[in-house]
């Protein structure tokens, strides 16, 4: 048996459960016996028997030296990392760890503006100053792509004291930059590269997919095993390459951000998922790519719909892409992505990953079969047929994405500053003190410290009218916004 077929953590907790020890420790449900019967019946006794805590035989995520240490070492081997840290705080916890491991108060980190809210949270917690790079905007789809080598070089030239660069690779929509070149550029200046790889756990295991962060030589990568790798929701990993980053510092930070009640269900699922990817991943992902490509061709044969393919490549921001992500533009049907999402839910019980003003995103994984793909194509064909009248007569739909606002003060200073509430319509020109984002994908429209513009307000109104999930402000009716208080001179 090869090393990658071993599951020391999963096998260890199962063996412990089979011994059926008498538990005088938490959790108090005691293998389900003290739990609501309906919930226990639904979850099952196997799962409840390994809902355990860090007792002696089971190691401790905060100080791994036994089965958790072995499982993390196997994961590092599988992903080509020097060290791998398991996260039960999701990829958000891993992302925060990355950032707080390399920057402190007042230090600079270069980040694209289309970052997940966890990145901005880490910047607030650390007190770092973000240097924003404008991501390339796709004018046809209305989505953000990655950052370019040219933009990274300009940022490094302007801010040679930056302590790190964060890259989203691949993006939520599966678009990848030339990560290897970006890493080489940063390393030539001794700047570590941190990768938000939340949507790319699978790319390491198939040559037809973009290079993974570790393959490209990045220093750290927060990788969501639960998203596309087969582990339970909220389980993730942080891969680390030593050199510009200290693994001991990373262990300290991730421990600070991690609950002491670590879920062994989540940890065991990471161990099992790693084995599955390392031993069967290439075949499973190859089949997934085949399913997605077939569906893409069928969707593109439907009048009024467009599913993105290889033709998107070739620009400075679209170096490679993940074909298992189906970006489906519905704008030529005269409806929003949210309209399509709701219709698919109500008529076919199909749930998509996300929708925006112009698109829906469907994620294909090795948990899918031809049955699910055929149902999706059938549903989309019916949806298009409902809106076929007038497709040809419609003029091309232009997409609208507002410019990135000016940052007036650091997000941390804004977050902790004295604030006041003003009417939404009167907030133009004021400095925002709260996050506003559409979630999913969790990319901020405004972050604390930015100056509010009319185009930002118009974009918020448009998303709200479309029914999209705009989140963040204290006032979820959007009648008011919290801004930095302005002090007038005493007369």
Curated annotation (Swiss-Prot):
The keyword Cytoplasm is assigned to this record: yes
One of the protein's GO biological processes: spermidine biosynthetic process
GO cellular component, one term: cytoplasm
Cellular localization per UniProt: Cytoplasm
EC number: 4.1.1.19
Keyword Amino-acid biosynthesis: no
Positions where N6-(pyridoxal phosphate)lysine occurs in the chain: 227
Catalytic activity: L-arginine + H(+) = agmatine + CO2
GO MF, one example: arginine decarboxylase activity
Cofactors, names only: pyridoxal 5'-phosphate
One Pfam family matching this protein: OKR_DC_1
InterPro entries, alphabetized: Orn/Lys/Arg_deCO2ase_major_dom, Orn_Lys_Arg_decarboxylase-I, Prn/Lys/Arg_de-COase_C, Prn/Lys/Arg_de-COase_C_sf, PyrdxlP-dep_Trfase, PyrdxlP-dep_Trfase_major
PROSITE patterns in alphabetical order: OKR_DC_1 (PS00703)
Family the entry assigns: Belongs to the Orn/Lys/Arg decarboxylase class-I family.
Official protein name in the record: Arginine decarboxylase
Native source species: Halalkalibacterium halodurans (strain ATCC BAA-125 / DSM 18197 / FERM 7344 / JCM 9153 / C-125) (Bacillus halodurans)
Encoding gene (name): speA
């Amino acid at each position: 048996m090869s090393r990658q077929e071993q599951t020391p953590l999963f096998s260890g907790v199962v063996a412990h459960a089979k011994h059926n020890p008498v538990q005088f420790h938490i959790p108090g449900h005691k293998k389900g016996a003290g739990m609501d019967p309906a919930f226990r019946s639904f979850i099952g006794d196997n799962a409840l028997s390994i809902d355990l805590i860090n007792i002696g035989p089971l190691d401790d995520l905060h100080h791994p030296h036994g089965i958790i240490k072995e499982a993390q070492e196997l994961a590092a081997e599988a992903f080509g990392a020097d060290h791998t840290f398991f996260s039960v705080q999701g990829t958000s916890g891993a992302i925060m760890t990355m950032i707080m491991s390399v920057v402190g108060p007042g230090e600079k980190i270069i980040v694209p503006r289309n970052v997940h809210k966890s990145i901005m949270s880490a910047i607030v917690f650390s007190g770092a100053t973000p240097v924003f790079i404008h991501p390339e905007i796709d004018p046809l789809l209305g989505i953000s792509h990655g950052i370019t080598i040219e933009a990274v070089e300009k940022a490094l030239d302007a801010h040679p004291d930056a302590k790190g660069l964060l890259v989203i690779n691949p993006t939520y929509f599966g678009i990848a930059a030339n990560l290897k070149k970006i890493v080489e550029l940063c390393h030539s200046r001794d700047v570590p590269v941190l990768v938000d790889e939340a949507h790319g756990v699978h790319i390491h295991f198939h040559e037809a997919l973009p290079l993974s962060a570790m393959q490209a030589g990045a220093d750290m990568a927060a990788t969501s095993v639960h998203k596309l790798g087969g582990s339970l929701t909220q389980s993730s990993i942080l891969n680390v390459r030593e050199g510009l980053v200290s693994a001991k510092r990373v262990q300290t930070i991730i421990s600070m951000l991690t609950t002491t009640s670590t879920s062994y269900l989540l940890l065991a699922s990471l161990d099992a998922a790693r084995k599955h990817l390392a031993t069967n991943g290439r075949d499973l992902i190859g089949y997934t790519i085949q399913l997605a490509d077939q569906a893409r061709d069928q969707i593109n044969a439907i009048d009024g719909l467009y599913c993105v393919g290889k033709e998107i490549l070739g620009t400075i921001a679209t170096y490679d892409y993940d074909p298992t992500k189906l970006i489906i533009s519905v704008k030529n049907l005269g409806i929003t992505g949210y309209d399509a999402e709701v219709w698919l839910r109500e008529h076919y019980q199909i749930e998509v990953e996300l929708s925006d003003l112009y698109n829906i995103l469907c994620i294909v994984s090795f948990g899918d079969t031809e049955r699910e793909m055929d149902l999706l194509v059938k549903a989309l064909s019916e949806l298009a047929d409902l809106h076929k009248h007038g497709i040809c007569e419609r003029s091309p739909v232009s997409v609208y994405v507002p410019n990135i606002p000016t940052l007036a003060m650091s997000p941390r200073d804004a977050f902790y500053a004295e604030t006041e509430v003003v009417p939404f319509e009167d907030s133009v020109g004021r400095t925002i003190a709260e996050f506003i984002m559409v979630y999913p994908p969790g990319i901020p429209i405004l972050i604390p410290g930015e100056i509010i513009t009319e185009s930002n307000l118009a974009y918020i109104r448009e998303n709200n009218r479309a029914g999209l999930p705009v989140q963040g402000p204290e006032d979820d009716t959007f009648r008011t916004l919290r801004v930095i208080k302005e002090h007038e001179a005493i007369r």
